[in-house]
Structures are given as structure tokens and as C-alpha cells.
Amino acid sequence: MAGSLPPCVVDCGTGYTKLGYAGNTEPQFIIPSCIAIRESAKVVDQAQRRVLRGVDDLDFFIGDEAIDKPTYATKWPIRHGIIEDWDLMERFMEQVVFKYLRAEPEDHYFLMTEPPLNTPENREYLAEIMFESFNVPGLYIAVQAVLALAASWTSRQVGERTLTGIVIDSGDGVTHVIPVAEGYVIGSCIKHIPIAGRDITYFIQQLLREREVGIPPEQSLETAKAIKEKYCYICPDIVKEFAKYDVDPRKWIKQYTGINAINQKKFVIDVGYERFLGPEIFFHPEFANPDFMESISDVVDEVIQNCPIDVRRPLYKNVVLSGGSTMFRDFGRRLQRDLKRVVDARLRLSEELSGGRIKPKPVEVQVVTHHMQRYAVWFGGSMLASTPEFFQVCHTKKDYEEYGPSICRHNPVFGVMS
């Protein structure tokens, strides 16, 4: 039975969880990764929470329903891509499987995703939840970066498909730059950038707060988020962009209309410089975070330079974007331009230092944008879980019962795929 039904693919992120069945091109559900629980007191430690079993166990909501429950305590079990509260995560998965996917977990193999640098203990916890609580027949825990690389195959011919590339995975809570060679993540070279979708939302909120007085305070964050998703883009040159707005404001300044949740009145705000200043913090992080000064193009270059010398050219040639925060218009174009500048400057310098005797071969820089970018990780998982090899690399319930959760510490790479 388990082999005949499609596997379930679940990609849990900091902000949103993407879930659906393998073989589909996009997830069936995209829900906020939050859970609303009834708590007698707001601050209850985990030990006490376990005592509140019974009826309270079933009295919780996840996703959009959780956000709409003001009388419940809303928790976000995942922070910066890593699961922090496993009790809540188990309950979250309970509704994901039964209420959203409406699946019988005993009949479906599961593909779950994990962030780079996830600890082996976390894999064990996840295996325990899936095998013990849900009794799944098989589980595979895939690294998000490898799935994002596989998802980028939609944009190239079959002969050019490769599992070597550098993945820029930027979601709501964390941005990682991850080099992958032949399907193996080069763990020692991964860099983490403390700027992601949520930081852009906070930055836009701050810019609006200084200028727009009409926004109801309790709605300022969701207003900033809506503006970010609707109007923001990446500009090629920030000084010229300011000038453009000053010369012809009516062409560039947009209006956002919101509705006050309390008295249902409309409020209108002008959206000006925020449109390009918000996402600009990827390239000038010092605008929002004085502790971090390195632009995303410099980080990518540094990561590739830390990698073994024989994979550097293929990495420059395959920079793959993944995640919702890379969806800003012209993000790929700007990144490719900045990265090319850094690389060309280095080649020129080496030529000068050799006194013109060495002519370095130019390095091809290519940033891959594709139409599956936003749900790249989920779509990559859906592709890989619909191949026949998937069932061979899964850890099975039988293995789990024989050896214990430690089997999930290592998940074989799809070697046959590349």
C-alpha cells in the first residue's frame, strides 16, 4: 500500500510550511508555521505543558487559523530554520497530516526537509516523532539546498543538469549561502547571513513608522509585510533611484489601502522610497543591522573562494536562488552584476601583479532564476520523491525498529540522480 500511494513532502520553514504530495508541481497548502494553544497561564514551561494532556491536547489550531485566534497563545516552534520546541512540533505535524493532507500516515512515505548544519540529534528527534507517533513506513530527511538545486533543473536542458552549484536560500527567518558539489553539501564553507524576509519587513515597518501616522499600531507589521510583497523591487543604483523618485514622484509613488481591523475604516498610505530601500538591505546590510556589513554578493564570493579550487568555476556558473525573499524583481540580475564585478576585479589584480605576463581565463558568473523559485525546496522534494530511487534511499520502519533513531543521522544522497 505504502509504495502505491504518493509520498508526502513537508517543508517546514520559519515563516511558512509548504506541504503536499509528491509528483505535483506546487504545494497543496502553504500555511504559517505557527500553532495556537490554550494556556492557563501565558508562561508555562514545557514540563508543565506535558501535564495538560487530555482534552487540551486537541484544543489547538495551526496555520492561518492560529493567527486568527486572539484568545489563544500563538507559538512559532521554528526559529531561524531550526525546530526549537519538539512538543509543539509534534502537535503541529498531527494537524498537517490529518487535517490538511488528510492522509493515513501508515500508507505514505514521508520526505521532510532540514536546514544546513542541522544537528544529528535533531534528525533523531524528527525520526522519533514520525516513526513512533505517526507510524510512517519510511522517512527521508533531505537537505534543503540539494532540493533547491534539483528544482532549478526546470530551467535547463537534460544534459546540463547538475548537482554542483551554490544555493542562496533566503526565507523568512534566515538566509544561507550553501555550496554543493555533486550533491554533497560542503559544510565547512556554509555562510549564514542574518538578514531575511522578516528583517526586511521590520525595516519597512520602521521607515513607515517615521513617516506615516495613519497606520493602526497593531497592524503596522502586516501592513509592512503586504507592502513588501506587493511593491518592493531591487534597484540597480540607489542614488539614481532616489533621483528618479524626486523628479517624477507621481509615476513611482504607489498607494496602499488598508482596512482598520477595529473600526473597519479605510486608511491610505503612500509607498515611496520603501519600495527599493527594503530589499536593498541584502546589498547594504548596514542600513538595518549595524553589526553586519557584508553585502550578499561579497558573502557568495567569499564562500566560493573558501571551497576547493576545482569546484570554484562550476559554482560561479550555477548560483541558484531559492525561497520567498529572493523573489524581488531584478534580484538575480543585480546579484549577477555585483558578483561579476568582484570576480573581474580579482582577475585584473592578478594580471597586474604578474606584470601582465599571466592572462587569467575569464570566469563565467551565472545566477539562475527560475519559475519554481519561491517553493524551490518543496518542488525539488516533490521531484525527487516521485523517482523510483526514493523508496530505496528511505529509512524504513523496519530499520528503525531494528537499529533505533540513529539510522536517520545520515541520509544517502541521490547518487543516481546527477
UniProtKB/Swiss-Prot annotation:
One of its GO terms (cellular component) is cytoplasm. InterPro entries: Actin, Actin/actin-like_CS, ATPase_NBD. The keyword ATP-binding applies. It is found in: Cytoplasm, Cytoskeleton; Cell projection. The keyword Cell membrane does not apply. GO terms for molecular function: actin binding; ATP binding. Detected in fetal brain. Detected throughout the adult brain, in neurons from gray matter, but not in white matter. Detected in liver, skeletal muscle and pancreas. Detected in lung adenocarcinoma cells with low metastatic potential, but not in lung adenocarcinoma cells with high metastatic potential. Keywords: Actin-binding, ATP-binding, Cell projection, Cytoplasm, Cytoskeleton, Nucleotide-binding. Interacts with the Arp2/3 complex composed of ARP2, ARP3, ARPC1B, ARPC1B/p41-ARC, ARPC2/p34-ARC, ARPC3/p21-ARC, ARPC4/p20-ARC and ARPC5/p16-ARC. Plays a role in the organization of the actin cytoskeleton. May function as ATP-binding component of the Arp2/3 complex which is involved in regulation of actin polymerization and together with an activating nucleation-promoting factor (NPF) mediates the formation of branched actin networks. May decrease the metastatic potential of tumors. Belongs to the actin family. ARP3 subfamily. PANTHER family: ACTIN. This is Actin-related protein 3B. The gene is ACTR3B.
